[in-house]
Amino acid sequence: MKKLTKVLLVAGSVAVLAACGSSKKDESAGQMFGGYSVQDLQQRYNTVYFGFDKYNIEGEYVQILDAHAAFLNATPATKVVVEGNTDERGTPEYNIALGQRRADAVKHYLSAKGVQAGQVSTVSYGEEKPAVLGHDEAAYSKNRRAVLAY
């Protein structure tokens, strides 16, 4: 009977400790990366905008992408999909290719900052998923983007 009590006590302790454990993602939730919280990176600062027919990353996005790189390096189990998008000008085929170049530019930037290739995948939606509907420069500028989707 004493042996059974000890076994049950040990098993119960292990179960309680296992229930208290948290995942790596949970542990990073309160941390800051480059001055940004994980929630901000995933919801507010997850978009890089591009100029017309461009796919180079402008300086204003370096700090944000550095923060994403720091987060991804600190949480190697985390994965992100970089979604490349364009405005409606150009042929669908051209826009798919341009959206892919935008997504690849972000992926290569993150890779250069030490993020593992398996953590980042890319997809191009071209003009198919506009952030803003409209046929003017204000709408177009919001649609020329790459989104980091966690």
From Swiss-Prot:
Its main location: membrane. CDD domains: OmpA_C-like. Pfam families: OmpA. Residues 1-19 form the signal peptide. A lipid is attached at C20 (S-diacylglycerol cysteine). It is found in: Cell outer membrane. SUPFAM superfamilies: OmpA-like (SSF103088). Keywords: Cell cycle, Cell division, Cell outer membrane, Lipoprotein, Membrane, Palmitate, Signal. It is a lipid-anchor. GO terms for cellular component: cell outer membrane. A lipid is attached at C20 (N-palmitoyl cysteine). GO terms for biological process: cell division. Residues 37-150 form the OmpA-like domain. InterPro entries: Bact_OuterMem_StrucFunc, OMP_bac, OmpA-like, OMPA-like_CS, OmpA-like_sf, Pal, Pal_lipo_C. Part of the Tol-Pal system, which plays a role in outer membrane invagination during cell division and is important for maintaining outer membrane integrity. The Tol-Pal system is composed of five core proteins: the inner membrane proteins TolA, TolQ and TolR, the periplasmic protein TolB and the outer membrane protein Pal. They form a network linking the inner and outer membranes and the peptidoglycan layer. Belongs to the Pal lipoprotein family. PANTHER family: LIPOPROTEIN YIAD-RELATED, STATOR ELEMENT OF FLAGELLAR MOTOR COMPLEX. This is Peptidoglycan-associated lipoprotein. It comes from Pasteurella multocida (strain Pm70). The gene is pal.
